Amino acid sequence: MTGYVANIEKLSIENENFRAVLYTDKNVQLVVMSLLPGEEIGMEVHHLDQFIRVESGEGKAILDGVEHAIGDGVAIVVPQGTNHNIINTSSEKMLKLYTLYCPPNHKDGTVHKTKADAEADEAEHFDGVMSE
């Protein structure tokens, strides 16, 4: 296989995991995420660039202290070094999104069912192994 082709909207909406890595190459990684009602990713900063697109739900993105309302179809670009957080503000509906890390941030094939699983996995950062 060369590259990755899939209906990312469908995969994002169907995903029930906090995080699932779908594809990893040396310069880019595709990940789907789902946040439970009221859940947040948590304030973080990366030494890489990140693109996020919301497929379903509502929430807010905080980039270097500035809050932005987000929902279906909203795109977020997070330049390296930016403190950021994504928060699901709904009390009923999951926030479904996908993200591109440039370069990769997680081990290829990583799946975290819950945020607690992700926080407990100390060895899940990108190790140089790609999807193909």
PLM features: what roles do these ranges have?
Residues M1-N27, K113-E132:
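A short, N-terminal "cap"/entry segment at the start of jelly-roll beta-barrel domains
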Residues N15-E16, V31-H46:
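Conserved short histidine dyad/triad with adjacent acidic residue
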Residues V28, P37, H47, V66, ...:
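A generic "binding-loop/recognition-motif" signal
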Residues M43, I62-D64, H68-A69:
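Helix-adjacent hinge/juxtasegments
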Residues D49-G59, D64:
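Glycine- and acidic-residue-biased ligand/ion/polar-headgroup-sensing regions
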Residues K60, Q80-K107:
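Ligand-binding loop in jelly-roll beta-barrel domains
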Residues V66-Q80:
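Short acidic-glycine-tyrosine-enriched beta hairpin
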